[in-house]
């Protein structure tokens, strides 16, 4: 049996966040008596909760100028002090249940080097869960499945991996987008297969607001820290569609859709680059015609989009027709000797 060290970076324990974070931590404790739990950071209430629930505490962690924790500092310290070989980084609002434990046991018994990750299920939880109720897990799972809000493959909230896998981590900050997709990319880049456990594990995300950020949801997803995270991963980005295996019905199966999904992403990227390249090339013509790039999603923006598409598409068709006509006659343009 592979025992687990779970580590997380809680927000301040206050209000609704206090309730859902305690729910999450107590659910991890119910996975197995020997599970080790580490909370990282000195945010309000963290030390007191660690003492109350009997979990380990890493108080000091590197932060940026806004006080947001660096992912690298969290990962390096957690891997250094973890008692067990298998670690799990999970967001501190995620309730894990027995299906998660079974998934970890299955994969860790078959693979020495791996990353298990999965999509979350969004659920409204506004009160403390009753862990003394023997049916708490069945009730919560039923609520999640009935709500039926499983996130897309871009949203990953737990990562299970052997100690030492992440020996190099860029200067991402936690709580902003981008770093989770980099973790997937890095695992594949060092030869560790990814197991998508989304079909086998109901990982319950307890919904919350974004009042912890001064600019709310917009600041979390599009603020300066988010933009820095995006720049850090550049093209080093994967989703669960790139998983090597999927876990389903207690069995690991090769992800047959992996190459198709990757090809689709490359195609979309190519279309975007082609579109914006043609916009640059045709800018003088479009300006002469009084057309501008659209930044609005309203009626005017949509009209400009179709006008631009007509001009760009027409020019692209003319270019393709010229290339086809030249090469179909066996001619080579002047100055292009072969």
PLM feature spans:
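C-terminal catalytic/acceptor-binding lobe
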Residues: 173-316
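Short, acidic, metal-binding catalytic loop of nucleotide-sugar glycosyltransferases
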Residues: 23-35
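Conserved catalytic core of nucleotide-sugar-dependent glycosyltransferases
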Residues: 95-180
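N-proximal low-complexity "stem/linker" segments adjacent to membrane-targeting elements
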Residues: 1-22
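Catalytic phosphate/metal-binding cores of nucleic-acid and nucleotide-processing enzymes, i.e., regions
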Residues: 18-24, 42-44, 67, 71-72, ...
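Short beta-strand/loop segment that forms part of the nucleotide-sugar
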Residues: 34-44
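Active-site-proximal specificity loops/subdomain of glycosyltransferases
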Residues: 45-85
């Amino acid at each position: 049996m592979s025992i687990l060290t779970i580590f997380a970076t809680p927000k301040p324990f206050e209000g609704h966040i206090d309730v859902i974070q305690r729910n999450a931590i107590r659910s991890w404790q119910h996975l197995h008596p020997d599970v080790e739990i580490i909370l990282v950071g000195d945010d309000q209430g963290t030390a007191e909760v660690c003492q109350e629930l009997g979990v380990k505490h890493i108080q000091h962690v590197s932060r940026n100028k806004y006080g947001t924790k660096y992912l690298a500092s969290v990962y390096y310290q957690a891997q250094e002090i973890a008692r067990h070989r298998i670690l799990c980084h999970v967001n501190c609002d995620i309730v894990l249940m027995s299906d998660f434990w079974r998934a970890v046991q299955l994969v860790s018994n078959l693979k020495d080097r791996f990353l298990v990750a999965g999509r979350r299920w969004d659920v409204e939880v506004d009160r403390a869960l009753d862990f003394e109720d023997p049916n708490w897990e069945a009730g919560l799972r039923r609520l999640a499945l009935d709500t039926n809000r499983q996130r897309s493959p871009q949203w990953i909230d737990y990562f299970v991996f052997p100690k030492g896998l992440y020996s190099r981590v860029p200067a991402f900050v936690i709580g902003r987008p981008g770093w989770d997709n980099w973790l997937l990319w890095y695992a594949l880049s060092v030869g560790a297969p990814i197991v998508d456990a989304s079909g086998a594990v109901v990982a319950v995300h307890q919904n919350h607001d974004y009042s912890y950020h001064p600019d709310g949801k917009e600041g979390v997803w599009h603020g300066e820290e988010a933009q820095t995270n995006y720049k850090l991963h550049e093209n080093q980005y994967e989703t669960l569609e790139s998983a090597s295996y999927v876990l389903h019905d207690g069995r690991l199966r090769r992800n047959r859709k992996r190459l198709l999904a990757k090809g689709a992403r490359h195609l979309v990227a190519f279309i975007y680059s082609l579109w914006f390249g043609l916009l640059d090339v045709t800018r003088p013509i479009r300006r002469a015609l009084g057309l501008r790039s659209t930044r609005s999603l309203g009626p005017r923006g949509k009209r400009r989009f179709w006008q631009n598409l007509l001009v760009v598409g027409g020019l692209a068709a003319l270019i393709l027709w010229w290339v086809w006509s030249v090469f179909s006659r066996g001619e080579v343009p002047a100055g292009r000797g072969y």
